[in-house]
Amino acid sequence: MRAIMEQRRRMLTKEEVEKDSALIMSQLEQMSAFVEAQTVLMYYPVHNEVDLRPLLAKYQGQKTFLFPVTHRHSMEVRPYDGEDMMRKGRLGVPEPQTPTFKGHIDLMLVPGVVFDQHRHRIGRGGGYYDRFLSKHPTSIKYGVCYGFQLKKHDVPHWLHDHKMDRVITPQQSIG
């Protein structure tokens, strides 16, 4: 299932990514969890993932945006301080070169390959987010994905997997 969904996402056009990402951001900006959040964990989109980066410029100086930095078996987060402070990390994804953020994260915007109606998530398979989320039980977790990535049937999940508080697609929000 993971490979099929990733392939379908990679086939999206630039216009489809921009349109659907804008629809998701529009919903997100109306949600109290985002409005009230001081610290927001983002991600750098790869392979046509939903692109939330326009929020960085729009809310610059109003919110602290964080991005993941991966290590061999773990993930930490660092504040975003402009594109010129981003360097490709060990997985080839741009990461901030700022000091590690140790405070509370109000809202986490989490990518995924597949989500279900019960807000379970399948990621890329490395377990980075699940291990990280377990250390932040009080943070609000929103999954973001395209409509075709949200399945009506349950996706496989285990005890160590973390359910999202909400899943947002261009068409709907569940949670």
Where are the language model's segments positioned?
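Short glycine-/acidic-enriched loop or helix-start segments at secondary-structure transitions
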Residues: D51-P54, V77, H118-R121, H153-D154
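Short, active-site-adjacent cap segments at secondary-structure transitions
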Residues: N48-V50, Y129, K151
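Surface-exposed, charge/polar-rich loops and edge strands
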Residues: Q7, G103-M108, Q117-H120, R131-G175
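A structured binding-face within diverse protein domains that lines the active/interaction site
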Residues: P94, P111-V114
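Charged helix-capping and loop-helix junction motifs
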Residues: G123-Y128
